[in-house]
Swiss-Prot record:
The lineage of its organism: Eukaryota, Metazoa, Chordata, Craniata, Vertebrata. This is Polypeptide N-acetylgalactosaminyltransferase 1. Keywords: Disulfide bond, Glycoprotein, Glycosyltransferase, Golgi apparatus, Lectin, Manganese, Membrane, Metal-binding, Secreted, Signal-anchor, Transferase, Transmembrane, Transmembrane helix. Glycans are attached at N95, N552. Substrate binds at D156, R186, W316, R347, Y352. The gene is GALNT1. Gene3D superfamilies: 2.80.10.50, Spore Coat Polysaccharide Biosynthesis Protein SpsA, Chain A. It comes from the Eukaryota.
Length: 559
């Protein structure tokens, strides 16, 4: 009996311990879930810790967020606020996990500990709480603490209440100094960044947009390049965060920055010459002619030496090309560091308004950069964009003085040595309209895009969409597109210029006035009755409908 009683005591004690273990396990499991839910909210008292392992939640590991059908209408209304899926963004944790999208060779690189410190400057205007704070947390969570001096948030006159005191209260509790600087009035990206740079303290200034997410290992390779050469300005690979689902998609290390005829920034394939320079090692930085402008790091002192931003430019637009030209022409280097990845929400439209209108502001800014940096090539730009010549672009004497002081190289040097594959044709037979003798109509790109048909329309003599270049390589170019025909009697389409002749090779006879498509041995003809706005090729007949006048456009009157 005594032995039986002893066994019952042992059994009961064991059962109690098992139940206690189960209780503790369930308790802490639920607590973890509570913490995870809290991280998705807005309470200013929460300080989020670095992500140690992937969470199970919307958008984790960069996966897309799917909105239930019953919430689609509300989602569409919320989308209008910031021109991205605000509902999806608010479902995602402020410190969500992201995949490591670096090249394998980047993951094993070792960087010195004594890299310079950086201040991260982020300008915002009426930004969503979730995207702004997710940017901040990604910087904190994925940056070595001793390299991150501070984060400077510059408020460009936001009107939303949660971006006032609630934001200040929230960032005070973060484990890295975060300063909120307020612009007294709407000043635009350029002047707001100058304000942030002026108050920052790091040896390097890193500019980010307000809807970014930094990935693991993003900072060290940027700072390492600047430590190697303080005159090197570096950009990360810009990954895409979907504005619809907030899916994180890795950007390509095989593209770099350029620009088209209208001085719009464009991404183009990295040319073979740059691959050869790097001996095929894709983990080495890419020398890029221009940068997108939203995300880059620059040595603080060098930023001052080369003239920071052009403070005479307004709001936004053109400043990225201006600083790109200036860096290269004045002795610096501009790189995309392929081992650094930062995501950016790319929107299809802007939610912001611009005083004076977007077109007027960009025309002014582009006029300033053309007058200061493009030398004789500004004439080409003015022919393509005649509206630019009619804007008041202000006083540029200080910027011209800066160029003289820094002994900067001419723009022709930039095109020959840094951007030889530029879309600006340096050697051409004609630049202007291509007019049909019979109809008196002109070829017109109709503002159409790649893979669309070229048009024909009444000649207006104002340049713009009716400016074509007949190049020394016998291409007919409109911006970065070439006229291309792939079949007999086919329509003429606009494809990316490949410089391989083939379907893009045209022979102009200045006596017969014909444009012969060499591959097909047919001639460019007027539009047909079936499609009155699309020219095609036909068997060469010598008819007036196959005769074309190539006329150079005269420079518009400049104010």
């Amino acid at each position: 009996m005594r032995k039986f009683a002893y066994c019952k005591v042992v059994l009961a004690t064991s059962l109690i311990w098992v139940l206690l273990d189960m209780f503790l396990l369930l308790y802490f499991s639920e607590c973890n879930k509570c913490d995870e839910k809290k991280e998705r909210g807005l309470p200013a008292g929460d300080v989020l810790e670095p992500v140690q392992k992937p969470h199970e939640g919307p958008g984790e590991m960069g996966k897309p967020v799917v909105i239930p059908k019953e919430d689609q209408d509300k989602m569409k209304e919320m989308f209008k606020i910031n021109q991205f899926n605000l509902m999806a963004s608010e479902m995602i944790a402020l410190n969500r996990s992201l995949p490591d999208v670096r090249l394998e060779g980047c993951k094993t690189k070792v960087y010195p500990d004594n890299l310079p410190t950086t201040s991260v400057v982020i300008v915002f205007h009426n930004e969503a709480w979730s995207t702004l704070l997710r940017t901040v947390h990604s910087v904190i969570n994925r940056s070595p603490r001793h390299m991150l001096e501070e984060i400077v948030l510059v408020d460009d006159a936001s009107e939303r209440d949660f971006l006032k005191r609630p934001l200040e209260s929230y960032v005070k509790k973060l484990k890295v100094p975060v300063h909120v600087i307020r612009m007294e009035q709407r000043s635009g990206l350029i002047r707001a960044r100058l304000k942030g740079a002026a108050v920052s303290k790091g040896q390097v200034i890193t500019f980010l947009d307000a809807h970014c997410e930094c990935t693991v290992g993003w900072l060290e390779p940027l700072l390492a390049r600047i430590k190697h050469d303080r005159k090197t300005v570096v950009c990360p690979i810009i990954d895409v965060i979907s504005d619809d689902t907030f899916e994180y998609m890795a950007g390509s290390d095989m593209t770099y920055g350029g620009f088209n005829w209208k001085l719009n920034f464009r991404w183009y394939p990295v040319p073979q010459r740059e691959m050869d320079r790097r001996k095929g090692d894709r983990t080495l930085p890419v020398r890029t002619p221009t940068m997108a402008g939203g995300l880059f790091s620059i040595d603080r002192d060098y930023f001052q030496e080369i003239g920071t931003y052009d403070a005479g430019m307004d709001i936004w637009g053109g400043e990225n090309l201006e600083i790109s030209f200036r860096i290269w022409q004045c002795g610096g280097t501009l790189e995309i560091v392929t081992c650094s990845h930062v995501g950016h929400v790319f929107r299809k439209a802007t939610p912001y308004t611009f005083p004076g209108g977007t077109g007027q502001i960009i025309n002014k800014n582009n006029r300033r950069l053309a007058e200061v940096w493009m030398d004789e090539f500004k004439t080409f730009f003015y022919i393509i964009s005649p509206g630019v010549t009619k804007v008041d672009y202000g006083d540029i004497s200080s910027r011209l003085g800066l160029r003289h002081k820094l002994q900067c190289r001419p723009f022709s040097w930039y095109l020959e040595n840094i951007y030889p594959d530029s879309q600006i044709p340096r050697h051409y037979s004609s630049l202007g309209e291509i007019r049909n003798v019979e109809t008196n109509q002109c070829l017109d790109n109709m503002a159409r895009k790649e893979n669309e048909k070229v048009g024909i329309f009444n000649c207006h003599g104002m340049g713009g969409n009716q400016v074509f270049s007949y190049t020394a390589n016998k291409e007919i170019r409109t911006d970065d597109l070439c006229l291309d025909v792939s079949k007999l009697n086919g329509p003429v389409t606009m494809l990316k210029c490949h410089h391989l002749k083939g379907n893009q090779l045209w022979e102009y006879d200045p006596v017969k006035l014909t444009l012969q498509h060499v591959n097909s041995n047919q001639c460019l003809d007027k539009a047909t009755e079936e499609d009155s706005q699309v020219p095609s090729i036909r068997d060469c007949s010598g008819s007036r409908s196959q005769q074309w006048l190539l006329r150079n456009v005269t420079l518009p009157e400049i104010f």
